[in-house]
């Protein structure tokens, strides 16, 4: 398995130039038959189910990572283990917090393209919390509660601020399935920024109450991502699974 420190400074230096996104776009998408999906906070791997159901008929080999939500190192290591098992070019997609994992683990040599779904996309070594403070605080933040070192979202905040455009009955099921996260997870910083060397795609949720939509737009623009905007809550992968599947198919070289 690749360690977080095993990548050369040559890659980092080459990726630092703002020309990289344009050069990657000119080179085109590398066809991929593998897709690895990573979930964020207040969820588990099943949150991708409706997207998976649209990717598999296209012949894609899809794996949804069960993110441990303990520390960033643990989460990245789990994603890397799944990436190690892929048999060729792979699209790595993440929702919400797992954009941190995509950004870090995305330097894995089997990853061909990156997809961010209303996701964090920090630069290498960047303090995401400090970056987010440049934008109004999203309402969901007030709904996080802790039992000791474990955090979760209250039901009211989940239904209103996380999954506001999902039918209430389904949103309540998703609320019951959310995986608690450990406080230590929030202290991690990415050491690499895969989007500086990999072709990237981004789905902005314009009605997001968990990550500020303008912050999403900033991160998408900074990485030079192919970007779509969806009139969606934070969980566009659930409320707009076809659009998210289409974006992943585009990243896999099966759509234009």
Residue spans for each PLM region:
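C-terminal segment of N-terminal export signals and the immediately downstream linker at the start
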Residues: 1, 21-38
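N-terminal export signals
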Residues: 6-26
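Conserved HGGG/HGGXW glycine-rich cap/lid loop of the alpha/beta-hydrolase fold
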Residues: 33-72
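Active-site loop/oxyanion-hole signature of alpha/beta-hydrolase fold enzymes
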Residues: 57, 61-91, 105-108, 128-133
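Gly/Ala-rich beta-loop-alpha elbow adjacent to hydrolase catalytic centers
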Residues: 94, 98, 102
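Flexible "cap/lid" loop of the alpha/beta hydrolase fold
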Residues: 111, 115-148
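Conserved serine/cysteine hydrolase catalytic core
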Residues: 182-223, 229-232, 237
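Post-His helix in hydrolase/transferase enzymes
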Residues: 238-250
């Amino acid at each position: 398995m690749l360690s977080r420190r095993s990548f050369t400074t040559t890659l980092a230096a080459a990726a630092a130039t703002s020309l990289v996104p344009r050069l990657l776009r000119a080179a085109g998408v590398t066809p991929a038959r593998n897709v690895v999906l990573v979930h964020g906070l207040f969820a588990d791997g099943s949150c991708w189910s409706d997207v998976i159901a649209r990717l598999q008929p296209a012949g894609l080999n899809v794996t949804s990572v069960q993110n441990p939500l303990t520390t960033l190192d643990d989460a990245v290591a789990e994603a890397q283990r799944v990436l190690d098992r892929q048999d060729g070019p792979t699209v790595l997609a993440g929702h919400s917090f797992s954009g941190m994992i995509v950004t870090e683990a995305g330097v894995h040599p089997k990853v061909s393209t990156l997809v961010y779904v209303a996701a964090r996309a920090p630069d290498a070594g960047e303090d995401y919390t400090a970056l987010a403070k440049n934008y109004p605080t999203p309402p969901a933040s007030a709904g996080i509660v802790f039992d000791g070192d474990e955090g979760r979202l209250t039901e009211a905040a989940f239904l209103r601020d996380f999954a506001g455009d999902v039918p209430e009955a389904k949103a309540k099921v998703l609320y019951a399935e959310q995986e608690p996260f450990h406080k230590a997870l929030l202290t991690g910083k990415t050491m690499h920024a895969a989007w500086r060397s990999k072709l990237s795609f981004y789905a902005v949720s314009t009605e997001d109450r968990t990550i500020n939509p303008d912050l999403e737009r900033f991160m998408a623009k900074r990485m030079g991502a192919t970007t779509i905007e969806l009139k969606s809550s934070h969980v566009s992968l659930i409320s707009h699974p076809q659009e998210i599947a289409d974006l992943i198919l585009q990243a896999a070289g099966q759509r234009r």
